[in-house]
Amino acid sequence: MLTLYKFALEPIAELSGDPGSYGFRHDRSAEKAALRLMDECAHDDEFVWVLKADIHSCFDSIAHKWLLSHIPMDKQMLSRFLSCGYIDKNRKYPLRRGIPQGGSLSSLLCNMTLDGLEDYLHEVCGEN
């Protein structure tokens, strides 16, 4: 069922997604990111800033409240996905924050959460 929601959300995420974001996106890869970077640098006589980011505990830090208010999908289904938790040694642990890594929606929800970061960095740091 969640995979169907993923298929429904993917076109929305692609339209609203940051153009410079290459992680967990259809038809994007590290190789394509490197090619775009080389192309950007080849046509510019000025210095170009490059940001490679690894957001520490990104999946574990995403607030459920934010997701429920910003992700355009059935709120009850999203809430169930977010609260499913995990099982370790026959004991269930609920999630109060973050999204389950490896879930069919997880990488898409992470990307949708980070959308806007590229524009914010351009605004704060300048266009280049």
Where are these regions (language model features)?
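Conserved polymerase palm-domain catalytic core
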Residues: 19-20, 35-128
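Charged boundary/loop elements
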Residues: 7, 11-20
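Duplex nucleic acid-engaging cores and interfaces of nucleic-acid transaction enzymes
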Residues: 1-2, 30, 34, 38
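Active/ligand-binding-proximal structured segments within catalytic/core domains
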Residues: 1-9, 110
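Basic- and aromatic-enriched surface patches that contact anionic nucleotides/nucleic acids
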Residues: 23
